[in-house]
């Protein structure tokens, strides 16, 4: 069914909550392990219509944040979502209280029961009002960001549409683009500062209600991190600061030499090549045709997947006024249909987001069609889900010539370099959030000072050159995740460590790398992060020394593939 034909009906929340009570009673009373497993499948199906309606509303709202109807529907889910989540938690509580609960682990693997324990520990009726308030705060942030229109080049442009200007070979044009963006954020400075203060206060209050010290502690439960905690994440960040940052300084020196920009400032960083960055082929249909060819040749599974996505018009990827920034993949369970949202702006990032979100969507497509995988275990925790997307970016490389033509080698260098360099920024975002939630009384200026310290620690090559907004340390405010889904961002770093390993493997044997990837993807949400890495024969980045070897191999590859 085409996306435009999918019908939306606002769900009956009271009926759903009553159904949840029945399911909780069934879970509590299941007389043996087999019965408990069947109830688990049943409860997992029970949320399909609600989840589909919720995601349809969110898709339509993010496609046009100015549409009053979809804004009202989004508000409805913001207000009612916490009650549904908590009803789901009560079902989990009933499963955990059943004496046959171990049957779920035996049948589904390690993540099922551990995930329910995290759900129970992370949610409570006492936090419903606070959750509703948090949802409303996020919607306010999305409206500020999604409503951004700035004046440049005689045009009114959205933030994503500034992308090509930020990559212009004329430094004055780049500076003007960054200043236009900075002007918008500076104009909303007080609102953004106040919103973040409220978000930190709200989430820390939720944590205290649930018996945690602060939200940095609760976030590990809410993010469903299984088998590791703050100590392991800090050990990983320490390895990045110690073993990756020195390698990245070599990489940035290579970039400066390549571009001929002797003393690059922040607005020079998007320039990767002297004669301009790689540009994908123009035209929506041309790109979609190239993607279809690429996925048809990659594997039979991806061929079936891309036909389904394109034939059912499950992409909205072109930027326009009122559309929310960023990109995402979501799922419409009643239709077994993934959906991909993006904001193309005629930069190489258009291909990044296409292959990235297709990685998520491909995993969702397979999991939704596996009868052994319950709906709520179709997707693993986010640090694992991002492996699907980030590895896909690399594993499609043999077909990138279809999307880049003569710029293919430049894109290969740019993509590998950007993915490697990203580790430093991702760790800075994560450490920043730990500091914010552990020190909630910091003033806005103190928050910005902490951000600038982390920039020096993780990205010592950056010179902001008195750029408004960024120069005062407020650049973190344009990172959607910091407001919308705190502590998510490190997941990109953990998955990057897996994706870089898939990249290095694919250089030796692409077929072997793809088969390992497919094996990992097919485990859906039935395995933890470390188990998934072991499934594919990859190194676990928490282990001392695991990061250094990968970093050195990446630097060597980049040294050998300098072009432009």
Segments predicted by a language model, with ranges:
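Post-HExxH zinc-binding segment in Zn-dependent metallohydrolases
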Residues: 242-243, 368, 379-407, 416, ...
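Auxiliary, metal-adjacent structural segments of Zn-dependent hydrolase domains
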Residues: 274-334, 347-348
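Active-site recognition of the HExxH zinc-binding catalytic motif
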Residues: 342-368, 389-390, 394, 432, ...
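Long, K/E/R/D-enriched contiguous segments that form extended
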Residues: 261-290, 363, 420-422, 427
């Amino acid at each position: 069914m085409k996306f435009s034909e999918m019908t939306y009906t606002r769900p009956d929340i009271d009926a759903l909550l009553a159904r949840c009570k029945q399911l909780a009673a069934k879970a509590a009373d299941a007389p043996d392990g087999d019965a408990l497993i069947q109830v688990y499948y049943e409860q997992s199906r029970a949320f399909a219509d609600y989840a589909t309606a919720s995601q349809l509303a969110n898709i339509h709202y993010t496609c046009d944040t100015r549409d009053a109807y979809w804004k009202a529907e989004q508000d409805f889910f913001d207000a009612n979502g916490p009650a549904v989540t908590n009803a789901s938690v009560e079902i989990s509580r009933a499963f955990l209280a059943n004496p046959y609960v171990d049957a779920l682990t035996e049948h589904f693997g390690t993540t099922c029961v551990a995930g329910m324990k995290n759900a129970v520990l992370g949610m409570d009726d006492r936090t419903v009002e606070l959750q509703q308030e948090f949802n409303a705060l996020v919607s306010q942030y999305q409206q500020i960001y999604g409503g951004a229109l700035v004046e440049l080049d005689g045009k009114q442009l959205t933030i994503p549409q500034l992308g090509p200007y930020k990559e212009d070979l004329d430094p004055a044009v780049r500076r003007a683009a960054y200043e236009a963006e900075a002007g918008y954020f500076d104009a909303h400075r007080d609102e953004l500062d106040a919103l973040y203060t409220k978000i930190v206060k709200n989430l820390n209050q939720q944590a205290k209600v649930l018996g945690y010290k602060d939200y940095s502690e609760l976030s590990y439960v809410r993010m469903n991190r299984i088998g590791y905690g703050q100590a392991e994440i800090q050990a990983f960040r320490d390895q990045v600061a110690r073993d990756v940052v020195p390698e990245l300084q070599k990489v940035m020196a290579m970039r400066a030499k390549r571009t001929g920009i002797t003393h690059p400032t922040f607005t020079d960083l998007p320039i990767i090549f002297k004669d301009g960055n790689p540009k994908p082929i123009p035209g929506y249909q041309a790109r979609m045709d190239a993607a279809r060819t690429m996925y048809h040749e990659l594997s039979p599974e991806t061929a079936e997947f891309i036909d389904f996505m394109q034939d059912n018009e499950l992409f909205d990827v072109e930027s326009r006024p009122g559309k929310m920034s960023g990109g995402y993949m979501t799922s419409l369970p009643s239709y077994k249909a993934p959906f991909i949202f993006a904001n193309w702006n005629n930069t190489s990032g258009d291909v990044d987001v296409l292959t990235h979100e297709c990685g998520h969507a491909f995993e969702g497509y397979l999991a939704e069609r596996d009868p052994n995988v319950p709906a709520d275990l179709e997707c693993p925790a986010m640090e694992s889900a991002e492996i699907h997307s980030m590895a896909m970016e690399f594993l499609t490389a043999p077909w990138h010539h279809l999307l880049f033509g003569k710029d293919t080698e430049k894109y290969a260098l740019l993509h590998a370099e950007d993915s490697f360099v990203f580790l430093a920024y991702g760790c800075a975002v994560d450490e920043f959030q730990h500091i914010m939630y552990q020190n909630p009384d910091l003033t806005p200026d103190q928050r910005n000072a902490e951000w600038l310290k982390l920039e020096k620690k993780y990205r010592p090559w950056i010179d902001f050159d008195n750029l408004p907004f960024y120069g005062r340390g407020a650049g973190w405010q344009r990172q959607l995740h910091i407001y919308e889904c705190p502590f998510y961002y490190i997941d990109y770093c953990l998955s990057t460590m897996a994706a870089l390993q898939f990249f290095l493997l694919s250089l030796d044997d692409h077929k072997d790398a793809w088969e390992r990837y497919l094996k990992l993807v097919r485990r859906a949400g039935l395995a933890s992060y470390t188990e998934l890495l072991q499934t594919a024969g990859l190194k676990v980045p928490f282990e001392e020394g695991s990061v250094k070897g990968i970093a050195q191999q990446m630097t060597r590859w980049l040294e050998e593939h300098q072009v432009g």
